[in-house]
């Protein structure tokens, strides 16, 4: 079981997504699966990022609602670093 840590950016991003009317239980469900060390089902399109973000992973909570996260195995920590739309997170 991983301990979940939230960056300040993640906290702000989550507040914004809640304000936009997103079902936050979906985010909680994904985080709980990840914290339990389970693989996400294929519909979440979980994948490793590349380039400057190569140490992070991304999954799709909804088609345009993403979660960026990172595992730290040395202390069994899952760090949630951001959530939002593609535009919010990557400026695209």
Residue map of PLM features:
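A short, surface-exposed loop/turn module that caps and links secondary-structure elements
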Residues: 33-60
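Enriched for short, Lys/Arg-rich terminal
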Residues: 3, 9-12, 19-24, 50, ...
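N-terminal hydrophobic or amphipathic segments with adjacent small-residue motifs
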Residues: 31, 45, 76-78
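Secondary-structure boundary motif
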Residues: 16-19, 36
